[in-house]
Structure formats: C-alpha cells, structure tokens
Amino acid sequence: MIEAQGLIETDRLATLSVNGSGSLFWDSVASLYTSVYVWIPLALVAVFLIIRNVNPRRILLVLFLLAVTVLLCDQLSSSVCKPLFHRLRPTHDPNILNMVDTVNGYRGGLYGFFSGHAANSFGLAMFFVLLVKHRWFSLSVLIWAFLNSIIRTYLGVHFVGDIVVGAVTGMLIGSITYWIYSMFARKDKKSIDVRGSSLLYTRSGFMRSDVYLFISVLFGTYSVILILSCFN
C-alpha cells in the first residue's frame, strides 16, 4: 500500500510538471492539436498511402484492421478500464484539482484510466510502423502519437500514468492487429509484391515518395497549428 501510494504521488507530481504553461499560445497549440478536424488532410494522405502501396487484394483488410485497432483501444479504455478502476482525472482529483490548469474550462469526464487518446494514437502508429517499415516514417508517427498523448496531460485531463498505460496498451493492440494482417498476407501468396531498388521502396514495398509525402503533410500540419495559434 505504501509503495502504491508513493507511485500515485509521483504520478501526481509528474502530471503537474507537464500540465499547463500559463501561455495562451501553447494553450491554443494544445487545443488545436487535439482537434479531429486539423488531422483530416493527414488521414486522407494515409488512406492514399494505403491504396497506392498495398496490394488491392488486401486494401480493405488493412482499413478494416485499422478500424478494429481504434475500436479495441477505445472500448477497452472507455467501456472496461474506466468503469472498472474508477481513477479520477486530474481535473476531478480532490488532492490536486485546484492546482490543475485547464484550457477553455475543459475538464473531461470523471474517470481517466487509461487514456483512450494515447491507446488510439499508439495503436494506429504501431500498425503503420509495422506496415510501412521506414525509419523516418516510424519516428514521425511515433512522435505524433507521443505529442497527441502527452498534450492530454498538458490539458489536465490525464495523469502521466494514464498516458503510459494507454500507450503500451495501444502498441500491443496495434501489434496484434498487424500480426493478424501478416497472417492473411502470408497465406495470399499471389499478393506478394516484388519491388525493385531499395532507393525507391521501403522494405515492405511502399514507395518512398509516397512515404515522404505523408511526412511532409504531417509536418505541414504542425506548421499550420503553430501559425493558427498565433491568431487565437
């Protein structure tokens, strides 16, 4: 019990160290970053990446498993763990709620363990990392997932521990759904893609030009968020 209480206190301190900044600019950045709408262009490019580079026989399977990844992460968080563990969000924790900075008065629901945002983000990121197999792409999507997750702590609606458990859970689910995909791909011998130069294609046969397009749109979105935040 003493060790558990120590972990809880450490988690609270870590959370308060990440939460808020007193800056309207960074508050705006955090708010925009967690908006679904700002990521629509990147989502469209991700679908384009799949359609252009995955064998037509497996495109629907990939899209289906991506949806399953999100569904499993979301439901395990919201329908199983949050009602089961009843861990209050920082914004509702009586021990620290008066010390937590919020943005636009947003406090989230009552319970926050574990973070569905972190699980979804890392679940999708892990699936894409294993699917595309490109170093800079992998680094880019993992950074995206990390930022998408830790910003929830900045906003005060998740403890750092919620984020860590959500991230690990998401990566596990993303790995499992990709494994399911790989089993189907191995059975479908006719769908094996043989690509040419490694300068043009990743190890999994994705065109590097398409991968770099995705990365460019990702960092372009970061730039748009920063620019828009200057005027909010």
What spans do the regions from the language model cover?
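N-terminal transmembrane-helix/juxtamembrane module of multi-pass inner/ER membrane proteins
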Residues: 1-42, 77-107, 228-232
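Interfacial segments of alpha-helical transmembrane regions
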Residues: 48-76, 137-140
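Membrane-embedded catalytic cores of phosphoryl/pyrophosphoryl-handling enzymes
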Residues: 101-232
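Hydrophobic core of alpha-helical transmembrane segments in multi-pass integral membrane proteins
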Residues: 41-50, 67-68, 213-227
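N-terminal signal-anchor transmembrane alpha helix
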Residues: 1-3, 64-84, 217-225
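Alpha-helical transmembrane spans of integral membrane proteins, capturing the lipid-embedded, hydrophobic core
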Residues: 40, 63-71, 75, 163, ...
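Membrane-water interface at transmembrane helix exits
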Residues: 47-51, 73, 77-86, 129, ...
